[in-house]
Regions:
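A general structural signal for short secondary-structure junctions and capping/turn motifs
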Residues: 53-56, 94-96, 280-281, 382-385
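Short, well-ordered loop/turn elements at secondary-structure boundaries
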Residues: 58, 260, 283-285, 342-344, ...
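Active-site-facing alpha/beta catalytic cores
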Residues: 70-71, 75-324, 367, 375, ...
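Non-transmembrane, aqueous-exposed alpha-helical and coiled segments at domain scale
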Residues: 316-347, 354-403
């Protein structure tokens, strides 16, 4: 266990982006209730994910992490969970075929409610109210009552996360994730898409590989791995009162785990020195993600790694770069070189979403698909140049046909954003854009593999 740590030691550190609850007794009652609830995930599952991520850090696997910007109570529906899960599976099949490596599937699901905001207050006209911080803290409606932090929302978030996890586990192991079925969904989608000619060849090659396996007797009936899949959950560990209440000691190892998710990450705004969020995460044995952007200096990152992973355990740390399409190739190399020089065993993943938010002329927040793709290409270019492994992708997406990010082959225009703009926070890739990104990622992975083969020769 981490030295001088317990589940509430974070309370002695600086905690930014946490709500101020008006009634301390009500908050304490909710925290006590949560500590008596069953864990949402199990320590052994978190250890299995860590082992998988260690393989990715070593260049033998690839991480696909995706889901909602912020889950909401209003959009909680089994069809929404199913559709996002399905698109992640389709992306994983495409990436597995391209990389010839296992793809680790981690959802931003079953707990991704709270969001740090750039300002604690929101102004509409002459009225100023506390900002919306996520459905597990306060309400989105712009009224004084809705914006008051309510501890009972944590109980509802727990219930929704439990139901979401239950459905995800059923989908992952109950036959829905059948490899042949997943590929058929992709074929159906390609047939309706404007990029059928470009990506149809790869889809056909995947189909031929499945036919070959079938002829050899390798099919879902004979190989369980083709019938189901492993699927993990993750969210930003922002609301520390909830995370503390969900922390349990593993009876087998004696280590502490945050059982609200398999993997947790710390954001750009909460990883400063002396942070309560860093203090909490250094003591739980889950895999941890760290967002890395232009404001993070190499020496600060190295100190953070020494704090979060003093034993240099492989699979413990995933560094998620988020620079912006025009900054990644200038900013990321210094971090990669510093981490490589010091020998920290990290997995490098790319978040091409958060550095590429713009405001359209009609007032909608959006992310141009072309900028998202350009940041991914820059991320791969940096790792090719540095001789390191571009090991993952972290995206905000949905399986629904929303119109929140402009561009892509579906050619969503700024004028078209209003058609189906449903996000509670930041704009997400829709199903078609997510699949297009997977095919383009596959091309980048193939380029990386070609470079590795050339070096080996």
């Amino acid at each position: 266990m981490a030295s001088n740590w317990n589940a509430h030691s974070w309370r002695g550190h600086e905690a930014r982006h946490l709500p101020v609850y008006p009634h301390a007794d009500k908050l304490q009652a909710v925290e006590t209730t949560l500590t008596s609830f069953p864990p949402l995930v199990f320590a052994g599952e978190a250890r299995a994910l860590k082992a998988d991520l260690a393989e990715a850090a070593a260049g033998r696997a690839f991480l696909l992490q995706g889901g909602d910007c912020a889950e909401s109570f209003a959009e909680f529906h089994p069809n929404n969970i199913r559709d996002t899960f399905r698109v992640l599976l389709q992306m994983a099949v495409i990436l597995t075929f391209a990389s010839k490596q296992p793809v680790i599937k981690v959802g931003r699901m079953a707990g991704q409610f709270a969001k740090p905001r750039s300002s604690p207050m929101e102004r509409q006209g002459d009225v100023e109210l506390p900002s919306y911080l996520g459905d597990n803290i306060n309400g989105m409606d712009f009224t004084p009552e809705s914006r008051i932090p309510d501890p009972d929302r944590m109980l509802r978030a727990y219930s929704q996360a439990a139901a979401t996890l239950n459905l995800l586990r059923a989908f992952a192991t109950g036959g829905y994730a059948n490899l042949r079925q997943v590929h058929q969904w992709t074929l159906d989608h390609i047939g309706k898409s404007p990029w059928a000619a470009k990506f149809g060849e790869m889809a056909d090659r995947i189909g031929e590989a499945l036919d070959f396996m079938q002829a050899c007797g390798v099919n879902p009936a004979t190989v369980p791995q083709l019938q189901g899949t492993s699927f993990y959950t993750s969210h930003e560990a922002l609301l520390l009162q909830y995370e503390e209440a969900m922390t349990r000691q593993d009876s087998l190892t004696g280590k502490w785990y945050d059982t609200s998710a398999h993997m947790l990450w710390i954001g750009d705004r909460t990883r400063f020195e002396g942070s309560a969020h860093v203090e909490f995460l250094r003591g739980v044995d889950n895999p941890i993600g760290v967002k890395c952007g232009p404001s993070l200096a190499p020496d600060v990152l190295l100190k953070l790694l020494d704090t979060l992973n003093p034993g240099r355990e492989a699979g413990r740390i995933t560094l998620i770069s988020r620079y912006g399409y025009d900054k990644v190739e200038a900013g990321l190399p210094a971090l990669v070189r510093a981490v490589t020089r010091e020998g920290h065993p990290v997995l490098w993943s790319c978040d091409p979403m958060h550095g590429n938010v713009i405001k359209a002329d009609n007032g909608y927040k959006t992310r141009p698909f072309e900028r998202i793709l350009k940041e991914v290409e820059g991320f791969f270019a940096v790792h090719r140049a540095e001789g390191t492994h571009a090991g993952g992708i972290h995206i905000e997406m949905t399986g629904r046909d929303v119109t929140e990010c402009t561009g892509g082959a579906v050619a969503i225009s700024e004028a078209g954003l209003a058609d189906r703009y449903h996000t509670h926070c930041d704009p997400r890739l829709n199903a078609a854009q997510s699949l297009e990104l997977a095919f383009l990622l596959a091309e980048a992975i193939n380029l990386e593999r070609a470079g590795q083969k050339a070096q080996a020769a």
